[in-house]
């Protein structure tokens, strides 16, 4: 199954609380932190919520 490499590229300071909660749920704790998650609709939805703060790459 494909995986997503999610990298936080911008700070969450000044963003809404639900965006902060989403970053925490993804496991991102600061700028330039990376996590690898399964490519599932739940994670795609989370990434869509914070798309202005993260970058996403597909990894096999």
Swiss-Prot record:
The keyword Cell division does not apply. One of its GO terms (molecular function) is structural constituent of ribosome. The keyword Ribonucleoprotein applies. Pfam families: Ribosomal_L30. The gene is rpmD. One of its GO terms (cellular component) is cytosolic large ribosomal subunit. Keywords: Ribonucleoprotein, Ribosomal protein. It comes from the Bacteria. Transmembrane segments: none annotated. One of its GO terms (biological process) is translation. Belongs to the universal ribosomal protein uL30 family. Part of the 50S ribosomal subunit. This is Large ribosomal subunit protein uL30.
């Amino acid at each position: 199954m494909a995986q997503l490499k999610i990298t936080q590229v911008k700070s969450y300071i000044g963003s809404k609380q639900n965006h902060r909660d989403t970053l925490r749920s993804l496991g991102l704790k600061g700028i330039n932190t990376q996590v690898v998650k399964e490519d599932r609709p739940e994670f795609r939805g989370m990434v869509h919520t914070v798309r202005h703060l993260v970058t996403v790459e597909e990894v096999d």
